[in-house]
Swiss-Prot record:
EC number per UniProt: 2.8.1.12
One GO biological process term: Mo-molybdopterin cofactor biosynthetic process
Taxonomic placement: Bacteria, Pseudomonadati, Pseudomonadota, Gammaproteobacteria, Pasteurellales
UniProt GO molecular function: molybdopterin synthase activity
Protein's recorded name: Molybdopterin synthase catalytic subunit
Length: 151
């Protein structure tokens, strides 16, 4: 049973409800969940907030393509990709990637693949607030390097 939930939203997400949905089918043997949060320190500065913007049509298409690629590589059952936008504060959850499969290896690898591609290919723009003011966050070379293992 291949199903996916892809959401971009301002509201917080319910990890427990998502886990329940991911692991519901009796054929599921493994469920992985990654949750990314707003950290208090970035690039050597204290961060008090993060504002995320996106272009809805582009974002949904990019996320769907990432999920499709994961499904082509591994035998997966359910996938959840939920990304928040708008104003977030230190400690807030930004993103959840959840994958269920019959086997743990597929679930682990697909989750990492989706997150690596989401970080570099999904059109989200981040603006951090620090004591020195606001700044736009550019993609990191280390994030791009993570993609090499999937090529």
């Amino acid at each position: 049973m291949q199903q996916s939930v892809i959401e971009v939203q301002q509201a917080p997400f319910d990890q427990h409800a998502i886990y329940q949905w991911l692991s519901e089918p009796h054929s599921v043997g493994a469920t992985t969940i990654f949750v990314g949060k707003v950290r208090e320190m970035n690039l050597g500065d204290n961060v008090s907030g993060l504002y995320l913007e996106h272009y809805p049509a582009m974002t949904k298409k990019a996320l769907q393509e990432i999920v499709n690629q994961a499904r082509q590589r591994w035998e997966l059952q359910r996938i959840a990709v939920i990304h928040r936008i708008g104003q977030l504060h230190t400690g807030d959850e930004i993103v959840l990637v959840g994958v269920s499969s019959a086997h743990r290896g597929d679930a682990y690898l697909a989750n990492e693949f989706i997150m690596d591609y989401l970080k570099t290919k999904a059109p989200f723009w981040k603006r951090e607030t620090t004591a020195e003011g606001e700044r736009w966050i550019e993609s990191r070379e280390s994030d791009e390097q993570q993609l090499e293992k999937w090529r």
